[in-house]
């Protein structure tokens, strides 16, 4: 569960978040819509602990961001464009991320890639991926460790119709498993279908 109380954030004279208060429960998908610059990404980065609020608190599973914990740890995150090693395959990119973790094996990486529609055996390097393929890899990175919370900023940006449908299905399955999912989208249809 995430509890946001009176979250306020300014950049110079511009107030981006103004006394935002929300309670976000496990097992649900919450949609955030709005034009560019309205504060969706700032809110997501604040929840993650990447940006600190000027006023207010964000509590994740009973722990206050910036006080009890600095950065949320049990979350899969896509904020803006995910960064990858361009000269390596999708499998090698995920493998690199797991080198510091002992609990993720090659089979889990392969299953995750397949679940987002990427071929784990492909030797194609990420630098040659289309935008949609990079988005799929970003989603794979976010869900690979089976996180409790998913924070997804425009995860379907650049995907074709089939890709969008695939990702919607993945998100619905994760919701059924009790995950708390925050989804920013410019497409109201995504929000209508998923939330």
Question: What are the language-model segments listed below?
Answer:
Residues 33-35:
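The feature captures the beta-strand-to-loop junction immediately N-terminal to the Walker
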Residues 48:
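Helix-to-loop junction immediately C-terminal to a conserved catalytic motif
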Residues 56-71:
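Conserved ABC transporter NBD signature motif
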Residues 95, 106-121:
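Conserved ABC ATPase "signature" region
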Residues 139:
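Hydrophobic anchor residue at the start of the ABC signature
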Residues 150-154:
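Catalytic Walker B motif of ABC-type/P-loop ATPase nucleotide-binding domains
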